[in-house]
Amino acid sequence: MRHSIAPERRASIAAGILCLLIACAVALVVLTRERILLSVTLDLPGAVPGASDPSPRFEFARVDLGMAVILLLVFSAIMRTAYRIPGSRWIERGLVTPITIFLIAGLNGITDAGSLIAIYSLTSAMVLFDMAQLRASRLSATSPWALGTMVGIVPWGIIALHQVGGGLAGHPAPIFVQVITMTVLVLTAGASFAFWRERAGRTTAQWHIALSTTTTCLFAVEAAALIVTA
């Protein structure tokens, strides 16, 4: 007797295959183009508060944008196709979403390790609140989803602050980086809204899977295009 695969599983497998195909395309770009490295810096203590000399800053890490995108896609593909692993959907989202926004912050010129860690942590907290919503009986103004939404806005506020500050200082983010930022922001908000509708019983999980996969894949394509044009 043949067992049919649930629509959610079929959508997840299709998403995994798409991620793998795009990972191969991005790998080809990374191998043939110059790398884009995102700096991670740390301000060392030692300067006197109020002194004119700033605290010494050093670069202790560089993140290869292309390789990071490839790893995100491969990990997403594994989690999407390994639907028999309990909670694979949330394991994937819990890692991919924070790292994606971390990379976007780096593209917007945020290099301070403290800011980057805060962005990653707050985005992870948003995903954890969404996971908690799975056990909640209802959606309300104080439900885990609502609290997660409020927390999840903060990283985008930090990124927006740096974009505005860079523009006022005469060093605005490149137009293409602004497009990437706005695209991922809109799609991330859409995926969160789809999850809310899913928990409210107004739609199915396929919509959330489709939007979250579109976010990852479109970010990867835009990052590859940025590498090509760099």
Residue ranges and their predicted role:
Residues R2-S88, E92, T97-A230:
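Polytopic alpha-helical membrane-helix bundles and their juxtamembrane interface segments
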